[in-house]
Amino acid sequence: MIKFPQKKYEIIYADPPWQYRDRGTNGAAEHYYQTMSFADLAALPVRNIAAKDSVLFLWATYPQLPAAIALIEAWGFQYKTIGFQWIKQNRKSPGYFLGCGHWTRGNSECCLLGVRGKPKRKDASVSQLIFACREEHSKKPAEVREKIVKLMGDLPRIELFARQKVAGWDGWGNEYPDCDTKMDK
């Protein structure tokens, strides 16, 4: 496993590589990146890098909501609300993106908000809704990071399962440029 950072963060932003039962479908995450079981995700030492008063922003698809809330708790946080709701738009044509979904056609994804201790919100004007085009598989809109900083302030922050360097953010993950060790298969 990739070595975890040794410092404390007041903001933790994560887009876990969830495993799904429907691995055989064309949209399966396993076609794009290595996924992790709930047990492996829950075993990550996230609580060790969380400051006494900190906030967790955790992406989850709707079939994963119960597991996502359980993961928030496993990492030492308390679920509070949906922090952000991403309404996916098409890149090449007007209108909304429609995925396959599980019961109904999927269009949106949520980023849950959990707290540890008593973190302070800096700006109460931050909107939950994000209307942005869907890009490559699982890539989230950059606007989310901006809204997190506006909401909470310029605090020590890390993105878990990061794929790119972003100014002001530390990163950790199998695809993060500074990580020289890949996750165990």
Residue map of PLM features:
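Class I S-adenosyl-L-methionine-dependent methyltransferase catalytic core
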Residues: M1-K185
